Regions:
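Polar/charged low-complexity regulatory segments
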Residues: 2-235
Length: 235
């Protein structure tokens, strides 16, 4: 009986997983069409000459590039949030050495295509790329763009993060944490030091300290460093 029950539960799980996969597939198709204001056939045609082996190219972990072959597009999709003042630099990376052939489309050497779009989001810009240009993917990663820090993006919520929900929770977990945890602790230190003086214009010393504690303690590596420092100080 237990064996039959296990088989039935396994069957149900497999059906659920297949439904989820189909839903994600449709979501990715609709997102690509919506973002770049074209149709799926046009996107597939633009990247038809991309070798499938391109998907095995080693690429930097941040911001991350997803191969879109599962929806018939032989290209990488990249999405990240950046600060507003970084946007011109980002756009120039996309446009440099490429011919603009449409509102969202750039071409290099005839067969290297890039689709680009952007939208305002939380004191910054959300940028999207669809490209078979590996050099561009690496250049974007090397430029080290970053999302607006939480004390700007969510200034109105304050530094308390114990009860995040909705858009704020999604932003912290999928935008900020993804960027922040990609940095080393030394790089995090440098990031904060670079922004200390500008934060003085709208945050008191006490508020700044509260924001730093809230942001930094989200990272397990930083919490471990605090524990190590505490143990060392007690000796």
């Amino acid at each position: 009986m237990s064996s039959l029950k296990w088989m039935f539960e396994q069957f149900v799980r497999e059906r659920q997983n297949k439904r989820i996969e189909r839903a994600l597939l449709e979501e990715h198709k609709k997102a690509a069409v919506r973002l770049f204001e074209t149709n799926l056939d046009a996107l597939r045609k633009a990247f038809a000459c991309s070798p499938v082996s391109l998907q095995s190219t080693p690429l930097p972990s941040y911001p991350g590039a997803m191969w879109m072959g599962h929806i018939g597009i032989n290209a990488f999709s990249m999405t990240q949030d950046i600060e507003v003042e970084q946007f011109p630099v980002y756009f120039n990376l996309v446009a440099a050495g490429r011919e603009r052939v449409g509102q969202h489309q750039f071409v290099r050497d005839g067969s290297i295509h890039t689709f680009f779009c952007s939208a305002d989001r939380r004191s910054g810009k959300k940028v999207n790329l669809l490209t078979n240009d590996v050099e561009l993917v690496r250049a974007v990663s090397a430029a080290a763009f970053n999302p607006p820090p939480p004390w700007l993006a969510w200034y109105e919520l304050g530094s308390l993060m114990c009860s995040l929900q909705g858009d704020a929770q999604h932003w912290y977990e999928n935008v900020w944490d993804r960027y922040w945890e990609n940095l080393s602790l030394a790089e995090q230190d440098a990031f904060i030091e670079e922004r200390r003086s500008s934060a003085n214009a709208y945050l008191t010393a006490e508020e700044w300290a509260e924001w730093l504690e809230a942001v930094r303690t989200r990272d397990a590596r930083y919490r471990e460093r605090l524990r190590m420092d505490y143990r060392r100080d007690r000796r």
